[in-house]
UniProtKB/Swiss-Prot annotation:
Residue numbers spanned by region Disordered: 213-237
Family annotation (Pfam families): YdjM
Protein name: Uncharacterized protein ORF4
Keyword set, alphabetical order: Plasmid
Organism this protein belongs to: Methanothermobacter thermautotrophicus
Biased composition regions of type Low complexity, renumbered to the chain: 223-237
Length: 237
């Protein structure tokens, strides 16, 4: 158990990381494996697997990271740690999810050996959870034509990202009526058109729902209702 997860993560990092970061990753996991398997660690209080760190309080730093620092990094780390704990729930040992407040373990008493129905149910449940996870990450949703991975990477959305993290958005649409308008031109955000016009002309203020967007004004003649283009340069994600 000490070596299985580091080896898996090491293989994944070698495939995904750039060349200059692979050496550091290999050294980190080699050092981590030796430390975790050393006599000092085995005699320490953290040696018992699924005790101190397999609880709800472990998720708090990643939740804070998601909301206050970086959405992509926080979501990736939160999903990875929570899925790890969820799969450990489905073992006979289980996890004390509310440790140290409540030391009881949440577990599933599958049999360790044999090919009885419990093992088949366990494999089926794990397969369903894995399929749902893959669908959420890779498959397009009804609300976005691209997958979650594409949105995190900023690809497939029709948006050109610049080096200063700016975004140029070109939107073509038809104005209908004099009321407020909401459009959804790209997968990871929306634009709201607020009508603040008078009797002689219609003035629209448009703003993006994504973080860092600032409202801008677009003035149109009252008789102009055909295809109009707005261009917004917004900073932030």
């Amino acid at each position: 158990m000490v070596y299985s997860r580091p080896i898996f993560c090491l293989c994944g990092d070698i495939l995904w990381l750039s060349l200059e970061r692979r050496a550091f990753t290999i050294l980190f996991y080699v050092d981590n494996s030796f430390v975790c398997s050393s006599g000092l660690c085995r005699k320490g209080g953290v040696n018992e697997h699924k005790r101190q760190l397999h609880n709800v309080f472990t998720l708090i730093p990643f939740v804070l990271l998601y909301f206050f620092y970086d959405v992509t990094t926080g979501a990736a780390m939160l999903s990875g740690v929570s899925s790890h704990i969820l799969l450990d729930f489905m073992t006979p040992t289980g996890c004390p999810f509310f440790y140290p407040i409540y030391r009881g373990r949440y577990r599933v008493n599958w049999r360790h050996k044999g090919s009885g129905p419990r093992e088949k149910r366990a494999l089926t449940t794990i397969g369903i959870l894995a399929a749902i996870l893959l669908l959420v990450i890779y498959a397009p949703s009804p609300f976005a034509p691209t997958s979650a991975i594409s949105q995190w990477k900023g690809s497939g959305s029709g948006v050109n990202n610049t080096s200063n993290n700016g975004t140029d958005i070109n939107v073509n649409f038809n104005f209908r009526g004099n009321g407020d308008t909401w459009i959804h031109p790209y997968p990871n955000g929306s634009i709201f058109i607020d009508c603040v016009g008078d009797s002689n002309s219609r003035v629209y203020r448009y703003r993006a729902s994504s973080r860092g967007g600032q409202g801008k004004y677009l003035k149109l003649d009252s008789n102009t209702t055909e295809n109009k283009t707005t261009k917004q340069n917004e900073t932030g994600g």
